[in-house]
């Protein structure tokens, strides 16, 4: 008997599960710690991710010999950030799901510099996702702040979620985890 195909022509649930292995016990303490985006202008990006999305800068690292800086952001209380430099670095790199912004010095002044967001050919990286309590309220605030939208919550076939863009054009999905079951 042929395996039933999902409407998309992709893998069935069973086929997807058959491709997966049980986690090796040695990976028990692994965690997805960060995703990195290259940014042209750290001033614009830091403003966007802190003021618009409410993230906290939890660590900054400069590499003068290689002329770049790293900015780690997360949804953390700034009062919890250790003061000691080494402790702060270890703490920042042990947080779950941080966003690392990488700035190569000088790109902010280069008119021709831009980064590919992965949503046009050649496609690759797609987006990051931010969970919010109320998508419509969050998007109303984003509109008031002049944030660029790719998709508003009531647009398209997938109602109730939105996509906005950061200063470099990276897409950010805005979703409510409790409402996603109706879309999937």
Curated annotation (Swiss-Prot):
Q: Which cofactors are required for activity?
A: Zn(2+)
| Residues that, per the record, bind Zn(2+) | 34, 100, 127, 173
Reaction catalysed by this chain? Answer: (R)-S-lactoylglutathione = methylglyoxal + glutathione
Q: List the disulfide bonds.
A: 19-20, 61-139
Phosphothreonine is found on 107
Domain VOC, by residue range, is: 31-177
Q: What is its EC number?
A: 4.4.1.5
Q: Where does substrate bind?
A: 34, 38, 104, 123, 127, 157-158
The record's comment on protein family reads: Belongs to the glyoxalase I family.
Q: What does this protein do?
A: Catalyzes the conversion of hemimercaptal, formed from methylglyoxal and glutathione, to S-lactoylglutathione. Involved in the regulation of TNF-induced transcriptional activity of NF-kappa-B. Required for normal osteoclastogenesis.
Assembly and binders: Homodimer.
Looking up PANTHER family in the UniProt record yields: LACTOYLGLUTATHIONE LYASE, LACTOYLGLUTATHIONE LYASE GLYOXALASE I
The molecule here is called Lactoylglutathione lyase
